[in-house]
Amino acid sequence: MIETNPLIIELPENMKGKDYVIGDLHGCYDELLQLLKFVKFDIEKDRLFCVGDLKDRGPKQNECIALLDKKNKQGQQWFFSVLGNHDYVKNFLSKKLLKDYYTNLLTKLPYIYSVKHPFFKKFFIVHAEMRFFLQNMNNEEITNQLLNNNLSDEIFYSLDNNNIILSESQRKNIIWARDNFQYFVNKNQANITMGDFSFMFKEKNKQIVEKLKIFCGHNVVPFPIVIGHQIYCDTGACFGYNKPRLIEKFAKWGNRFFYLSMIDVNTGQVYGCVTSEKSEIYTEEDYKYNYKRGDVLTMNKTIY
């Protein structure tokens, strides 16, 4: 499937409504509908971008994939997703799927969406990492150059299928790599398995995202946050569905945060829909809220 997926799809500015970004869906269809209802999402005007991983783990992967085929009254697509690593792995397809139909939808997913925006030149959607065009620079150099205004935004804004040629392994890195995330974890000596996310709350993170908006998932975080030069928004929605092997991996974090996150691209406002039967969701100030599955909340802080 990897040979057929386009590398980059460019989309025009949304002149009618808002753009939103949703974290890794993993079949959490009902929670997505709750979020759309909460923000009064209008399919005739608004657009929703997913950072990938529509399927596996959650209860309604079929419904999530089928969103790719939905149109509004004008016949326009309103739901968009990039390719995630779980979307790429064919053998994860459920036996109940009508494989030809769903596989055909997944083979059309791009690795990257490049989207024009009225408030800033563009924003980007990618599943894991977008470092393929900066092969000779490490993450610290990228960060420093972004902060010091030495890295030209044009290197991002000029990307299209005509000037980027990638090998299969490089394409796989876009949906599988964790280098950027792990670099900053190691650099700050953070033990994320013990719930240490203090390294995320540095002021320079917000300075970076003011220059460059790259939304991604793949690495689970307790709330959407800027790490390095990317905005991570996978908040472990699927773990709320009592998958023992997966929940055990994050048990040290406590029963905190399993929810599906959605971001208003215009404002950086974060919304969440709880997937855990019972949970405590922590914001940056460690405010604690007791919620049950299906509850929707507005986070106290924006991410930019």
Where in this protein do the model-derived segments appear?
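Core catalytic region of metal-dependent phosphoesterases/phosphodiesterases
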Residues: K18, I22, G27-K99
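Active-site metal-binding loops of divalent metal-dependent hydrolases
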Residues: G23-L25, G52-K55, N85-D87, A128-M130, ...
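Beta-strand-turn-beta hairpins that frame and shape the catalytic cleft
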Residues: E13-Y20, S114-F124, I227-G228
